[in-house]
C-alpha cells in the first residue's frame, strides 16, 4: 500500500498549453484540482498545500512559470551543469518553505549520451539570502528508458522510487563492495558508504544497488541525511483524536475540525469556511454562473464535483461498499462518514456540555441550542428556526396549494396523515378503546394521552406555580396564563386566544360552519361536545344536572383563576 500524493492526481500546464484552453475547460481544471486536494486532506493525508492550489485561491492562473536556467544561474554548480539545457518551473510551495521543481526534459551531453532522453525532477529548497544558491536537491519521481554507462542508480523500494543522481551532484563514482554502510533510522536499513569511492574509474558500465523489499540505498551520506529529513516521522499529534501530522501547519488546519473555527468569511452573505479553497468555491454561487450541465436532465451546476455527484442519481452507481453491513454509497466521503456508525467514533464534542457527535453537522446543529441562534426565518410570518428542515416543515402551513382536501367538509391539509386523522371525525369510527373506563378514541395517540388520566402520571410541572400536567402541550397552554400571551388572533373581529383550538371554534361563529352533524335528526353543531350532549336525547339519557353544574363551576373557576394570574403578572 503506497500513499497517494497530490502530484499523482495533478495535471500541469505550460503557458502555451494554457492558452489553448477555453473558459469552460479552465474552470473544469480549477474545480478538479481543488476537489482532488480537498479529498486528500479529508482523508487525513499530511500533504503540503500545492502551489497550484494557492494560485487558485488567489484567483490567479495556475499554469507553470517557465524560465531558462543557464550554467551561470548557480555559480557553485557551474561545472556540474555544463553541456545541459535545463528548464526551471515553479511548482508546489510548502506553507513553511518555498520550493522549486527543476524538470529536465532533454539532456544534451557529450557524444556518449547524445541519444539518451529521460525525465528528472528535483526539488530545491531555499531561504532568504541563500535564494540564489543550491542548498540541496530532493529526488521525487524519476523515470528512465535506459541507463547510460557510468550512471549509478539508487533505489528505494519502500517509497517506490528510482533515484538517478549521476553528474548532478558529483562525478561518476564507484561503490566499493567492502565499504561501510550508512543506516537509515527511519527505514532501519543499511546503506553503502562513499568513503572509498572518490576518483575511482568505472570499469563495469553501471552500478545498480540491488535491495530487498524494503531497502533504501544511497551512495552518499548526505543523500541519506536528506532522505531521512524528507521522510521523517509525523511528530505533530492531535490531542483530540490522536491523528498525527508531519507539520504544525497541517495540524493547525486539522484542528479546525474540532474547534469549528471558520476564519474565511464571504463578504456577500457572511457565510464562513474553514478553508480558503472552500470560500473560493462558494463565491461562485453568488455569480450565478453554472457552466456544468447534466446531459440527462439538463440541470446545471456551478462546480464539476456537484455535476459528478448528481450524475450518480441517473446511473444509480454506488461503487463504495461498507465491509461491515454491505451498504453502498455513490461517494467515498459518504462511506467514510458511514463507517463511524460502526466504530462509534465521535470526534466532534461540544465544549459547553461535553456531548459528542459522530458527524460535524450534528455538532453545529446542537450548538445552536446553547447560542439560541435561529438563522432560518419564515418570510411569511417572520418566525425563526435553528434548522432549515424545521423551516421547510413550517412553510407548509403557508403553502397556497394544499394537496389533501376532505371530501366531507372541504377542509384542506398539508399532509395525508393529517387528512386521515381528520376524516375520523366524520366517520365517528373510534377503534381504540380504554380498558379502564371504556372510552373510545379515533387515534392511538389520543388513547395514550387519555390513559395518563387513570395513572395520574403528570410529568410536566409548571416552574412558576408548580401545577403538574400529564401532557406537554397542556403545560405550554397553561404557561400562557402566566405570560398573558394570546398569539392566535381572529382576522374577522380581532379577538385573541391562547389556544389555536379556541380560535378555530370561535371562527365558526363568523363562518356559520357546523361540522358535527347528528345522524338521527340531521341537526348540526359547531362543537363536538354539543353533539355528544345532543345525542343523549335520542338515547333517552338525561344529563345529570350535577355534572352540568360542576362543568359550569369548573369553567368559572378557570376563568377566575386566569384573571387572578393576569392581575398578578400585570
Swiss-Prot record:
Zinc finger (C2H2-type): 236-258, 264-286, 292-314, 320-342, 348-370, 376-398, 404-426, 432-454, 460-482, 488-510, 516-538
The name this protein goes by in its record: Zinc finger protein 181
Gene Ontology biological process: regulation of transcription by RNA polymerase II
GO CC terms: nucleus
Subcellular location: Nucleus
Keywords, in A-Z order: DNA-binding, Isopeptide bond, Metal-binding, Nucleus, Repeat, Transcription, Transcription regulation, Ubl conjugation, Zinc, Zinc-finger
Protein task: May be involved in transcriptional regulation.
Family: Belongs to the krueppel C2H2-type zinc-finger protein family.
Organism: Bos taurus
Highest taxon listed in the record's lineage: Eukaryota
Gene coding for it: ZNF181
Record-listed cross-link Glycyl lysine isopeptide (Lys-Gly) (interchain with G-Cter in SUMO2), residues: 125
GO molecular function: DNA-binding transcription factor activity, RNA polymerase II-specific; RNA polymerase II cis-regulatory region sequence-specific DNA binding; zinc ion binding
Main location: nucleus
Domain KRAB, first and last residues per copy: 4-75
Annotated SUPFAM superfamilies: beta-beta-alpha zinc fingers (SSF57667), KRAB domain (Kruppel-associated box) (SSF109640)
Matches recorded under InterPro entries: C2H2-ZF_domain, KRAB, KRAB_dom_sf, Znf_C2H2_sf, Znf_C2H2_type
Amino acid at each position: 500500500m503506497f500513499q497517494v500524493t497530490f502530484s499523482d492526481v495533478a495535471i500541469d500546464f505550460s503557458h502555451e498549453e494554457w492558452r489553448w484552453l477555453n473558459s469552460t475547460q479552465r474552470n473544469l481544471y480549477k474545480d478538479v484540482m481543488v476537489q482532488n486536494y480537498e479529498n486528500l486532506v479529508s482523508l487525513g493525508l499530511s500533504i503540503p498545500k500545492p502551489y497550484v492550489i494557492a494560485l487558485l485561491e488567489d484567483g490567479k492562473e495556475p499554469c507553470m512559470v517557465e524560465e531558462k536556467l543557464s550554467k551561470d544561474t548557480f555559480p557553485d554548480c557551474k561545472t556540474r551543469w555544463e553541456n545541459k539545457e535545463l528548464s526551471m518551473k515553479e511548482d508546489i510551495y510548502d506553507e513553511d518553505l518555498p520550493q522549486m521543481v527543476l524538470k529536465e526534459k532533454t539532456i544534451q551531453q557529450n557524444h556518449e549520451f547524445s541519444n539518451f532522453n529521460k525525465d528528472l525532477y528535483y526539488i530545491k529548497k531555499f531561504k532568504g539570502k541563500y535564494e540564489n544558491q543550491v542548498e540541496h536537491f530532493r529526488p521525487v519521481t524519476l523515470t528512465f528508458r535506459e541507463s547510460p554507462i557510468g550512471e549509478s542508480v539508487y533505489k528505494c523500494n519502500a517509497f517506490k522510487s528510482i533515484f538517478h543522481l549521476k553528474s548532478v551532484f558529483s562525478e561518476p563514482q564507484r561503490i566499493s563492495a567492502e565499504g561501510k554502510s550508512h543506516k537509515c533510522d527511519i527505514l532501519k536499513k543499511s546503506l553503502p558508504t562513499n568513503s572509498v569511492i572518490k576518483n575511482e574509474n568505472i570499469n563495469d558500465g553501471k552500478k545498480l544497488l540491488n535491495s530487498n523489499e524494503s531497502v533504501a540505498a544511497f551512495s552518499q551520506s548526505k543523500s541519506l541525511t536528506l532522505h531521512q529529513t524528507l521522510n521523517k516521522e509525523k511528530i505533530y499529534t492531535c490531542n483530540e483524536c490522536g491523528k498525527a501530522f508531519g507539520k504544525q501547519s497541517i495540524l493547525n488546519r486539522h484542528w479546525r475540525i474540532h474547534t469549528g473555527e471558520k476564519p474565511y468569511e464571504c463578504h456577500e452573505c457572511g457565510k464562513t469556511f474553514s478553508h480558503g479553497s472552500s470560500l473560493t468555491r462558494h463565491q461562485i454561487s453568488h455569480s450565478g454562473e453554472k457552466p456544468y450541465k447534466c446531459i440527462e436532465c439538463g440541470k446545471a451546476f456551478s462546480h464539476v464535483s456537484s455535476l459528478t455527484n448528481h450524475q450518480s442519481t441517473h446511473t444509480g452507481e454506488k461503487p463504495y461498499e461498507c465491509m461491515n453491513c454491505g451498504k453502498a454509497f455513490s461517494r467515498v466521503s459518504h462511506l467514510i462518514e458511514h463507517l463511524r456508525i460502526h466504530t462509534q467514533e465521535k470526534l466532534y464534542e461540544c465544549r459547553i456540555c461535553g456531548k459528542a457527535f459522530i458527524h460535524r453537522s450534528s455538532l453545529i446543529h446542537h450548538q445552536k441550542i446553547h447560542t439560541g441562534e435561529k438563522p432560518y426565518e419564515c418570510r411569511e410570518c417572520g418566525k425563526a428556526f435553528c434548522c432549515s428542515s424545521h423551516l421547510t416543515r413550517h412553510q407548509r402551513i403557508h403553502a397556497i396549494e394544499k394537496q389533501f382536501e376532505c371530501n366531507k367538509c372541504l377542509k384542506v391539509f398539508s399532509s395525508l396523515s393529517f387528512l386521515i386523522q381528520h376524516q375520523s371525525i366524520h366517520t365517528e369510527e373510534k377503534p381504540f378503546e380504554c380498558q379502564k373506563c371504556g372510552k373510545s378514541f379515533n387515534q392511538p395517540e389520543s388513547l395514550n394521552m387519555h390513559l395518563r388520566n387513570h395513572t395520574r402520571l403528570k410529568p410536566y410541572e409548571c416552574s412558576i406555580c408548580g401545577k403538574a400536567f400529564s401532557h406537554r402541550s397542556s403545560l405550554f397552554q397553561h404557561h400562557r396564563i402566566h405570560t398573558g400571551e394570546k398569539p392566535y388572533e381572529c382576522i374577522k373581529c380581532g379577538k385573541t386566544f391562547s389556544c389555536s383550538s379556541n380560535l378555530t371554534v370561535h371562527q365558526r361563529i363568523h363562518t356559520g360552519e357546523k361540522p358535527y352533524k347528528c345522524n338521527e335528526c340531521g341537526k348540526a353543531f359547531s362543537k363536538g361536545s354539543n353533539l355528544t350532549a345532543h345525542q343523549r336525547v335520542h338515547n333517552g339519557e338525561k344529563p345529570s344536572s350535577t355534572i352540568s353544574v360542576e362543568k359550569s363551576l369548573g369553567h368559572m373557576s378557570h376563568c377566575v383563576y386566569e384573571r387572578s394570574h393576569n392581575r398578578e403578572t400585570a
